[in-house]
């Protein structure tokens, strides 16, 4: 019968309405109020009482001298500065002695494609290359003489930076200040940057430590609503802040001419950086010292420069005194275990939000933990998806059982419901009253069929999010032709699943697993008789076909989950219906569906 399917549509519509309504009426107004408050704060930065004027966010270094009109090759840009090599288990690259920037980082073990011989992922690139992307640390201030900038050439105490061998850079400004920077890196993706200044001059100076990540040009993005790519940070009690590249263009002027952005003064704890789907670069200020965080977009010729920066409080150095500032830089893959470990070890506020877990965080992250647990047990994320789906089915079995029992009762009274519709065909009010009386008499809950679908919606979105955003799913194989669960099924019916020598267009991409999913969805719907309403009957007839094509471009892992979940639902419903003495109409419905043309054939005969 059609009530359970009608309930399914209602449940999906209501769930989507709740999600969209929350975003429109609650989340969006809150974000807009915060944006306006931040813009007002940013527009008029005030000097610190009793001291020199603080530098204005948006005027920090790092947003100049980056990209010449004719971009150099990456190798040519690297050769413009003497360098100290970086070599760890997870990273390779170099530190530029000119500018003291970390601007050359590639990720070992991560490749551009599923082919292990494809190039490794390059995360950071130097100024002057086609797409500069780098991290910079230093000092700004007044009356201190020359300060280190992008043209400063530092002196290094070694020629290699490893997890066991730190690197110290030194520079004397010739005006009484000696700058030292000690760089260290662990065996994953975290750099520690310890800056110190010694005042050998005759007068006091005031300096402000800063750290920034600068990216030249808008990168290619996935363009999905469920995924944030762009500027990201947790700014103390201001919480998570996410700004896309396009959104930055709409911000108010800040600092230097041609610069737009916003700032958060006086925050403590958190991080600021730029994130891609799987990779990120972020500076991490001292978690106990207040700072001003800022996001900016700057026009540099025809190029947009995106920058996140933290500006620490004023440090005054008397003659003969010294000062230190310690920060961190994360530059690498957003591995869940690594991100969580850094959050705990370095006590970085909400660092786990570097990964876009989405609205269903409370479901999404436990979902990943479960998948990861069974992956470590079986060594295959595809098998892990099957096991977790089975466990979820067993966990929700009591609710599903009550739902299917109610549906079975509704099937049993189907003749009476049909009679009521015929008896009150012209009086919908009396028809509804008679239906409700029948439900009360037979102790039937007409909306019970919604619950399995309502429960499945957040689980579906959570699994979709896990497959879509976690790097652990990237290039994770299943069996056979599925070499990447995070990518669509590579086969296509249009080229006979690879037998014909041409690639099928993405628009009509339809692989083996989407077809399997469509078949299981079709069988699940045939477990119940067609609804009496012809329009509903047509909708449910075409629904498996629509979903088959729609899921053709979805991650293979998600399609496998849906097909497996459909199969388990069929078995579960079959068992419950048999247990309650209700006839399983699957085979009768299939015979009816595939024999509809028989009378026509007989007439022709």
UniProtKB/Swiss-Prot annotation:
Presence of the UniProt keyword Cytoplasm in the record: no
CC terms in the record's Gene Ontology section? plasma membrane
**Looking at the record's lineage, which domain of life comes first?**
Bacteria
Q: Which GO terms describe its biological process?
A: protein insertion into membrane; protein transport
GO MF entries:
membrane insertase activity
Keywords carried by this UniProt record: Cell inner membrane, Cell membrane, Chaperone, Membrane, Protein transport, Transmembrane, Transmembrane helix, Transport
InterPro entries assigned to the protein according to its UniProt record, in alphabetical order: Membr_insert_YidC (IPR019998), Membr_insert_YidC_N (IPR028053), YidC/ALB3/OXA1/COX18 (IPR001708), YidC/Oxa/ALB_C (IPR028055), YidC_ALB_C (IPR047196), YidC_periplasmic_sf (IPR038221)
**Where are the membrane-spanning stretches?**
8-28, 377-397, 451-471, 496-516, 540-560
User: What is the recorded membrane topology of this protein?
Assistant: Multi-pass membrane protein
Q: Where in the cell is it found?
A: Cell inner membrane
Q: Please give the Gene3D superfamilies that the UniProt record associates with this protein.
A: 2.70.98.90
Task: Cite the residue spans of the region called Disordered.
Answer: 35-71
Q: Protein transport as a keyword?
A: yes
**Which Pfam families has this protein been placed in?**
60KD_IMP (PF02096), YidC_periplas (PF14849)
Stretches of Low complexity bias are at 35-47
Question: Subunit structure of this entry?
Answer: Interacts with the Sec translocase complex via SecD. Specifically interacts with transmembrane segments of nascent integral membrane proteins during membrane integration.
Q: Which family does it belong to?
A: Belongs to the OXA1/ALB3/YidC family. Type 1 subfamily.
Query: What's the stated role of this polypeptide?
Result: Required for the insertion and/or proper folding and/or complex formation of integral membrane proteins into the membrane. Involved in integration of membrane proteins that insert both dependently and independently of the Sec translocase complex, as well as at least some lipoproteins. Aids folding of multispanning membrane proteins.
Q: What is this protein called?
A: Membrane protein insertase YidC
Organism this protein belongs to: Methylobacterium nodulans (strain LMG 21967 / CNCM I-2342 / ORS 2060)
